Amino acid sequence: MPGLRRLLPLLLAALCPSALSLRHGPSKIAVVGGGIGGSAAAYFLRQKFGRSVQLHVLEKAALGGRLDTLDVEGDSYEAGGSVIHPLNLHMKHFVKELGLSVAPPQGSLAGVYNGEEFVFEESSWSFINLLKLLWHYGLNPLRMSMWVEDILDKFMRIYRFQMHDYAFSSNERLLHALGGDDFTRLLNQTIDEAMQQAGFSQKFINQVVCPAMRVNYGQGVTIPGFVGAVSLAGVQSGLWSVKGGNKLVCSGLIYSAKAEVIPGTVVSIEPKTRHKRGGDPVKLYEVTYNTSSGLTGDTYDIVVIAAPLGRKMANITFRNFDPPIPEFPNPYHQTITTLVHGRLNTSFFGYQDPQAFHLGAIFTTDNPKLFINSLGVVSPTGDTGTGGKLPLPSAVWKVFSNEELTKEQLNLLFSSYDSVKVKPWLAYPQYSAPEKFPPIVLHEQLYYLNGLERAASAMEMSAIAARNAALLAFHRWHGHSARVDQEDLHEKLKTEL
């Protein structure tokens, strides 16, 4: 029997000669960026390439990237990416896998303010809300839910494709595989144009759709239709966050991936060829980065960039690439998060009696006189939420604006306040239609995640881009072309069932 056990592998190798010609796995992979994209990339790369590969995550600041918290009087509050949609399956999987807890949604009444008055105010009675919506907007709200659901249904095909190990070498191919020409149209026209063509009223677009764009992306209805639809999904019910802060997902994924975190700012990447005696030359990437002890570097088989490229973001020089890696026009939009512990000046919003004001979330229409995009009562990351209660006279309010609020503006919004914390972000792309995407494959084994943000920026989009990049890197390394850029995948997978 021992002899037979030794013979079996030899017989299998003879029957499957291709097994012997499989390329060895990479020995070292670098991920640039420790936000949700980079941490998810490390997690998925470990899954695909196995235990033997060395994984380095290069992060210039704290893990979490644009997922961050601010401390206000001893409690921490979400200051960056705050909410997760119930259909965000990667984020749901991460939270379950890492044993994290879900913070319940904060339930407070909302209103839409146009700079002079509230054009819509929620009631605590759902029946009254239904009548109000019908009176103001007819069937537009119901039709919008169906319109967004149709787009999300197509987009959710990505989970099946990725579950079956399929990857895409460009963002355009990925999106076309999900939604065909419908998605291409949504990327090439504004949300205003897309919804007008779909028969939505201008009043509804101005008073409901535009405020959703402003709270989620700090921009109006000139953003492309695709990101607009994602933004509308971001104001639906069932949104949640991670207890203790969404950034816990990032540190948890990196720990789970057994990746080594190297604190440093990447300054350049250069292709290198190492010649081995009697063997084929080995192609590597030399990554140079700044640390607290000076300039240093290392070489890697594969590099995944999970930080937005650009002079104000990840300002990386690509040296001696042939052809050269071009600069991508990649402007990001500035959003200022201001957390204020204080009493809202309700008279600014037309309520002379503070006792009569019951709103805990205020969205705004597009009015050049308005210096805020939205404001709302928030709970600490470790709290159980407001549970639908009315805001307390003194609460912590989160204000989104495009510019830092002046003292005069704060005094207009609040009758009194104890503390103010400010966090400026280059939070998401400055969107414009038609949208152009940077490539995913920058060089043979050099990949770029953040281009998918130009379709829509969200935690889940970063996780999807991360899994796609990990699958793509794996298939390209091992020459599995049948798993890359397959046409009509939706139909193919249906017939496999």
Give short role names for the model-derived ranges:
Residues 474-497:
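Active-site-proximal substrate-binding core of FAD-dependent oxidoreductases
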Residues 46-72:
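Glycine-rich FAD pyrophosphate-binding loop
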Residues 168-182, 210-257:
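Helix-loop-beta segment of a Rossmann-like dinucleotide-binding subdomain
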Residues 227-302:
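Helical element adjacent to the flavin cofactor pocket in flavoenzyme catalytic cores
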Residues 26-56:
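N-terminal Rossmann-like FAD-binding beta1-loop-alpha1 element of flavoenzymes
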Residues 96-97, 101-220:
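Mobile amphipathic helical/loop "lid" adjacent to a hydrophobic cofactor/ligand pocket
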Residues 66-69, 74-106:
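Conserved FAD-binding subdomain of flavin-dependent enzymes
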Residues 300-302, 307-482:
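C-terminal segments that line or cap access tunnels to active or ligand-binding sites in enzymes
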